[in-house]
Structure formats: structure tokens, C-alpha cells
């Protein structure tokens, strides 16, 4: 059984540093409306989540601060993959 295409924005596959409240991670891919990243911890679909993604720009590092919800998780070894929607975001200097 296949899932219907649910993404509204094109994903960019790029490893970027993700900062969470009590953990760090790295993105597998991201888009304006969501991100998938590997981290440690326990997450539940539907759970609210806040995270920041570090971006390196021509004018220096920026933090893309995001709020959203966990869509799904994918356990792997000692890590967990987290797919999250982004419902609010701001861009700030690091």
C-alpha cells in the first residue's frame, strides 16, 4: 500500500544542524512547511514541537526558529527520525 502524495512544498535534501530543547540533530530534508531530522529522545505523532535549524548565509549564521507538530517518527538504532510540520517560523541572526 502506498501513501498518497501529501507534501505541499518541494523538499531540499541537505544536512543542517537542528537544535531542540534538550537535544541536537541533523536534517535529512526540509521545506517551507516541514522538516525531517534525526535526533535522540522520544516523540509522539501530534505532539507540539519547537526546533531551530542553523543556516549559513553570505552574511553569517542565521537561525530558522520553527514551531509545529510531529507527524511521524522512525526509530533507527539509537536515533529517531522525526517528521514535523512547520506552522510558525522566524529567521534570526545566530
What are these regions (language model features)?
Residues 25-27, 64-73:
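Short beta-strand-centered aromatic/proline hotspots
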Amino acid at each position: 500500500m502506498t501513501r498518497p502524495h501529501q507534501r505541499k512544498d518541494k523538499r531540499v535534501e541537505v544536512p543542517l544542524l537542528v537544535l531542540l530543547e534538550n537535544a541536537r540533530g541533523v536534517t535529512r530534508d526540509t521545506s517551507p512547511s516541514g522538516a525531517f531530522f534525526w535526533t535522540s529522545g522520544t516523540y509522539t505523532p501530534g505532539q507540539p514541537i519547537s526546533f531551530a535549524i542553523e543556516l549559513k548565509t553570505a552574511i553569517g549564521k542565521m537561525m530558522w526558529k520553527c514551531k509545529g507538530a510531529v507527524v511521524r517518527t522512525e526509530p533507527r538504532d539509537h536515533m529517531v527520525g522525526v517528521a514535523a510540520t512547520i506552522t510558525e517560523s522566524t529567521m534570526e541572526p545566530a
